[in-house]
Design a protein with these regions (language model features):
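A detector of single, family-specific signature residues
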Residues: 1-183
Length: 183
């Protein structure tokens, strides 16, 4: 990627609290590698990005779409059902990259101002903690894939906007239900 070597680094890195790597200017190296600031994705920092590059490599051409990437990470929901019969399948484990995304998602579970955290808490109430963490990890993996392959920066929409969208969705659902029952 010769065109991306001249990228100017203007952002500051996220702080790493525990087990910080002893690499000076890691943030600048990471941004110059792909030309995208991965630190804009909630839950991911430079060290996490370094670990993910170690697992996935720098060439993402082996994954044609985001669905192929999330499936390779082991973050897609598994539905072993035919007709009305659900098969009993032992838990399918993630690979190391999927586990890294799960660790990042678990850190966002109790976040106050991040939309992915709100999404996971809502899902945790309906399903299970493990399912919520896996779904949040899938969202992080999708944002990572889009940042690496397409250069799309992740923009955190925030908790208030997420809750407004949920409220609008709920109102439209109630309106449809009222029309259906002719109320």
């Amino acid at each position: 990627m010769p065109g991306k070597a001249n990228v100017e680094v203007t952002s500051t890195p996220k702080p790493i609290r525990h087990h910080a790597p002893k690499i000076t200017d890691l943030h600048q190296m990471v941004v110059k590698l792909h030309g995208v600031n991965i630190g804009s994705i909630s839950g991911l920092n430079d060290y996490t990005f370094l670990r993910l590059i170690g697992e996935t490599g720098t060439d993402m051409n082996r994954f044609p779409t985001v669905k192929h990437f999330t499936n390779w990470c082991g973050l897609t929901p598994q539905n072993h059902q035919t007709g009305k019969v659900k098969k009993r399948v032992e838990g399918i484990s993630c690979n190391k990259a999927g586990q890294i995304f799960k660790e990042c998602a678990q850190g966002l579970l109790n976040s106050k101002y991040i939309a992915i955290g709100s999404f996971m808490r809502k899902l945790k109430g309906r399903k299970d903690v493990a399912i919520a963490i896996k779904a949040g990890a899938k969202k992080l993996a999708e944002a990572y894939y889009n940042a690496i392959t397409k250069g799309i920066d992740y923009v955190e929409q925030g908790l208030k906007k997420h809750e407004q969208q949920l409220k609008i969705q709920e109102v439209s659902m109630l309106n449809r239900s009222a029309k259906k029952h002719k109320i």
